[in-house]
Amino acid sequence: MQKGEQRSVLELAQLAPGELRTLLQPFMGGQWHNDTPTLRIPYYRPLDPLRPGFLPGRAEQHLAGQVFSGLTRFDSTTQRPCGDLAHHWDISADGLRWDFYIRSTLHWHNGDVLSTSQLHQRLQQLLELPALNKLFISVKCIEVTHPQCLTFILHRPDFWLAHRLASYSSHLAHPEQPLVGTGPFRLTLFTPELVRIESHDHYHLSHPLLKAIEFWITPQLFDQDLGTSCRHPVQIAIGKPEELPMLSQVSSGISLGFCYLTLRKSARLNVLQARRLVNIIHHSSLLQTLEVEENLITPSNALLPGWTIPQWDQLDEVALPEKLTLVYHLPVELHAMAEQLRQVLATLGCELTLIFHNAKNWDGDHPLAQADLMMGDRLIGEAPEYTLEQWLRCDQLWPHVLDAPAFSHLQATLDALQTQANEDHRHAALQQVFTNLMNDATLTPLFNYHYRISAPPGVNGVRLNPRGWFEFTEAWLPPPSS
């Protein structure tokens, strides 16, 4: 246990939760092992493999950002792209050529010196993924124009390009070793029971203050009824119930991400009927009375701050369709939402068929073709406006919500919008796109989450980030008192 051996963790899995909590208590939170500061985080589920491209889970997205770096990254204060593997970049006057200047002192986690040609090779591999091909649809080619320069040639200007490269989905692993990166932490163990990352000695930016962070996968310690939910706060400690008051909530906030409802117009569902459905959700007590944990969610009145949902009057006389089908995926809070909506609509003469898609997104095989209504959640990690543009471009959802002409028009609008060099103008144009989707009752946000982080005494530098996690590079432990 003291050494954090994987076999010990496997043996623990056989213990009853009470015994396990008693045994693990001294080992959790911040510890010094052999004069090395280590943070151990109990986690309620195994982590999914870190694959290239988009990842469904918050924890996996966060971990990918610790292990891999991109050409650019999002500044944690401004949420704007800044240099990472590339220290600067230049954009030609016509917006069609972007030169990224690569740092000359980069090393992979295995100690090898990094070459620009390896980054080029990895980018080409990423562009072969269908979702990332959509994301980088404006890229004509990528070239190594100098040993320290990567050049992107575009079909049309794309002033989101630095944002696209900063997104965790575009972070760059070694082209031949997909779990080797250049981020602040290197992956040293990835099993269903234990994940361990250690600080990267050759990291090119500010070095982490902790040597190691471990995820101990201990579902027995968490409420078995929760399933896959966003309600698990990131709690860096375990204690008996009477000891939990020692944990102090160090950071909290409302998520920018949200659970949403989309509505497909058809012969079965017209715009007025869709608007009435949206009104029923937002103007009744439906969202306030969901059977979910207290202080977990807050009903949405805007898609993003300032992007408010529309108000419509005199829709009570609009007759609803006799039958509709709702398809939804995780998190589990949407079970409660779906059932509540089914009951409310039944009292209004509308029979709602529920189809649950047991996944965290719409990738792979999905039942969207059967749906009039769809529910899911839209995680937002950073740069919220850009993240929503990426959602419209890449998510399987939209070709099913919109008919073919409307979907083509949406993509053409995004293509035109990205050519605006001024970020405020891009944001305003994108807000108008979403305002139109909300006005048509094609999209409405349902609720946001309360994110909370609790830490035991002695774990410092824990600051909530937009994903509901904390920056691993900033956390630190004081030396043990002698």
Regions found by a protein language model. Give the residues of each.
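Detector for C-terminal structural segments
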Residues: P17-P26, Q31-N34, R276-T308, A336-Q340, ...
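N-terminal lobe/hinge region of extracytoplasmic solute-binding protein
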Residues: P42-I91
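A structural "hinge/loop" feature
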Residues: P46-E60, D112, L161-S167, Y449, ...
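Aromatic- and charge-enriched surface segment that lines or borders ligand/interaction sites
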Residues: P56, H88-A131
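Surface-exposed binding/hinge segments that line
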Residues: A131-E176, P184-L189
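A bilobed periplasmic-binding-protein/Venus flytrap-type ligand-binding module shared by bacterial periplasmic
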Residues: E198-D201, G253-R276, T289
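Ligand-site clamp/hinge motif
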Residues: H202-P245
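Ligand/substrate-recognition segments at binding pockets and active sites
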Residues: Q314-D377
